[in-house]
Amino acid sequence: MLTSVLVRLVAWSVRRPIWVVVLSLVAAALSGVYVAHHFKINTDISKLVENDPKWAALGHAIDDAFPQRSQTILAVVEAPAPEFAAAAANALADGLRREAEAGRIGQVSEPGGGPLFEHDGLLFLPEQDVATTTAQLASARPLINVLAKDPSIAGLATTLSTTLGVPLQSGQVKLSGMAKLLSRSAATVDDVLAGKPAAFSWRALVDADAAREPARAFVTVQPVVNYGALQAGEQASRTIRATAQALKLDERFGAAVRLTGEQPLADEEFASVQDGALVNGIATLAIVLVILWIALRSKRMIAAVFVTLFVGLVVTAALGLMMVGSLNMISVAFMVLFVGLGVDFAIQYGVKYREERHRDPNLEHALVGAAHAMGMPLTLATAAVAASFFSFLPTAYRGVSELGLIAGVGMFVALFTTLTLLPALLRLLAPPGERKPPGFPRLAPVDDYLDRHRKPILIGTLAVVIGALPLLAHLRFDFNPLHLKDPHSESMATLLALKDSPEASVNDVSLLAPSLAAANAAAQRLGALPEVGRTTTLSTFIPDAQPQKLATIAAAARELLPALTQPAAAPVSDAQRVAALKRASNLLEYAAEDYPGPGAAAAKHLSESLAKLAAADAATRERAEHAFSAPLKIALNQLAMLLQPSEITRKNLPPQIVRDWVAPDGRALVQISPKVPKGADPGDDAMLRRFAKAVKAAEPGTIGGPISILHSADTIIRAFLQAAALSVVSITVLLWITLRRFGDVLRTLVPLLVSGVVTLELCVLLGMPLNFANIIALPLMLGVGVAFKVYFVMAWRAGQTGLLQSSLTHAVLFSAATTATAFGSLWLSHHPGTASMGRLLALALSCTLIGAVVFQPVLMGKPRTKRVTNQSQGIDE
């Protein structure tokens, strides 16, 4: 009955082709207008997964209490010396605060910097370290006095010359003890002479951490985001870069600003999806055209297929927007799905039309005959594919759920246009007759071989597949979303460079406590866990033993501040500067000769470098002046501020810091960082799993970082298992209702399941873990696989033999080729997640195709001999 309805629909379309084409184009035009006015993409990835209310409440509570902490941008200021990095970060933060006042960005802060740490930084050291540091500074008072009096390069050269005189000769100083100073000075002068960015860090002489290159300082910015744009935080990033450029941080400090954090990572991820999309799209279209030409052998038929696809795609887009309101970053893939499966329907009908046209030259008879042969298989395939997509509707993975809804509806649109618009267009375009039927007659011997050796092939295949099942125990899900991002993008490269830095805090988790006292108690409990490296609350910013530390610092300040605050000497002429450099060079040469051993090579090197600097032009010496004198002035000023701290209390903490850790209603935040063993990878999955499990067990209210990622991974895996089970059940019921034979249902499902199992087994063998991106490939291939299996079982039920050489295999192979081209183009994407999806799709499609073309005919065997029976038959059997 259904076949006759479909045949009448095609016959009506063939008799009234102009009406059908006009109505289709009108529907496409109206749909296009709707899409143009309502097209929206929501790039907020937090909306892709629906968490259970209890879990969602934890995240919402922190977001509501501390909205400034979400989707932040971390501006990483890199400079040749920590003095320059700190000064550049301060300048950038001041400039960005003016932008925040204008409303272009949100809150601006300096992690580990700003006035609090500039004045009171020494108070955060342990009491013994404060005593040691101030004692060292006091003993260096004569040197500090000389440096502060004349911090110019001439003054530094003179100080060096003085040191190389009596102090060295009397043994007060040793050349070996000056080795670090001399070698670093020589390296800085060499950079100046080579025209490279150069700065001499005075902090690096006494602080090993400050010696790391490049030196970094940080500014955190809360962006004003627009989730209607592909790159929601792009405007904020532009503001930061423009501010840095306007402040001339590069010229003043040799500083560069790189952006990372949640928002830049998301923005660059979406940008990488776009990157190369046009070229890939054009290449994909060209390859699809070639494949269609080989499959259909007619420009008119190809034109008809493209028009049919375009109309169906526009109508599906309009229906999708009506149903979901706005697309998300996953549901937008419905276009690739529609093209891949829509082309399949068109090729199946078109190839069958070619076969019918070879038998009967009459165009209308061939079009109706193709509908009689393919109407039922196409309808069953559509229903099965749609069922596989609709199986995601009840799951918590909203991104794929909406994709399934749109793609499932799109399959019915594709079927309707294939059975109405495509025949009407072919009737109007009137392709020429077919000289030979489509198919692969050369594969007849393969058909015969498979038929004769059916049982050994079947047993061998199943033995290998079943024998490899233990591999599935090693199938891995990579839950770290950072592995899906382009490591060469600025935001990701910067984040990787910061993997050992607490400012990145990628793997930190958070706990919202009812009060600061409760937060401190929780921090103490969590800090005792072996998996936890550090806990932070507002109380972390209130140092202990402050009276003792303040007294120690005050004693040092009484000795050092007069030297640090004295007026600097007047600048000298360039001639005097040259003379000072030459004298220092000569004395270094003598010292290297007179005191061989450690430090002699560095002295010789610096002697040669200073001689070259003295012989260079005045502009080069000005750059050397900036490289040595500017960091020294900054360092001396920083030291003067550090020697004038004031007691830190809860009341006088900067309001911005308080707001970052305590909400207006009194609730307080605890930040917990994992303990990373020395030399270990901070992103190690096993370590993060242990950390997340331990912290969650100790404090069930913790959320964020690896805890949230693991929860999302569990939710997504559950969604896919639920959808897979629902899909198999719904497809089984659909096939049973349609085919009415349990054996035929198994002949359809077993090859599908075998293809899926083999795909996962090969993932293990090829080292391809599943992840948040490529797992989406599995339901896509389930849909394609169901369609292929349905075509073959319907042909087998109709009594067709020699399936490999048939027009059906011709259609399936070229349909798979177009689908592989559409999906495989993802493999070429610059986005690692999209590329991994393309790889898995290519693998899954290969397994699906082999399962349909080779394994399924072997499983089915020879067609049944039809006989008169009272058994209830399947639809149109």
UniProtKB/Swiss-Prot annotation:
Side of membrane Periplasmic, spans: 38-275, 322-326, 394-404, 478-718, 770-774, 829-839
Effect on the protein of changing D344Y: Growth is severely attenuated in the presence of chloramphenicol, novobiocin or polymyxin B
Superkingdom of the organism of origin: Bacteria
The entry's keywords: Cell inner membrane, Cell membrane, Lipid transport, Membrane, Transmembrane, Transmembrane helix, Transport
Domain SSD per the UniProt entry, residue ranges: 302-428
Gene deletion effect: Deletion mutant cannot grow in the presence of various antibiotics, including chloramphenicol, novobiocin and polymyxin B.
InterPro entries: Hopanoid_biosynth_HpnN, MMPL_dom, Mycobact_MmpL, SSD
Record localization: Cell inner membrane
GO cellular component terms attached to this protein's record: plasma membrane
Membrane topology (Cytoplasmic): 1-16, 297-300, 348-372, 426-456, 740-748, 796-807, 861-877
Cited Pfam families: MMPL
Membrane-traversing stretches: 17-37, 276-296, 301-321, 327-347, 373-393, 405-425, 457-477, 719-739, 749-769, 775-795, 808-828, 840-860
Effect of F117R: Growth is severely attenuated in the presence of chloramphenicol, novobiocin or polymyxin B
Protein family according to the UniProt entry: Belongs to the resistance-nodulation-cell division (RND) (TC 2.A.6) family. MmpL subfamily.
Role of this protein: Essential for hopanoid transport from the cytoplasmic to the outer membrane. Is capable of shuttling hopanoid lipids from the inner membrane to the periplasm, where they probably spontaneously insert to the inner leaflet of the outer membrane, strengthening the cell envelope. May be a proton-motive-force (PMF)-dependent transporter. Is critical for multidrug resistance and cell wall remodeling in Burkholderia.
Protein name as it appears in the record: Hopanoid transporter HpnN
Organism: Burkholderia thailandensis (strain ATCC 700388 / DSM 13276 / CCUG 48851 / CIP 106301 / E264)
Gene: hpnN
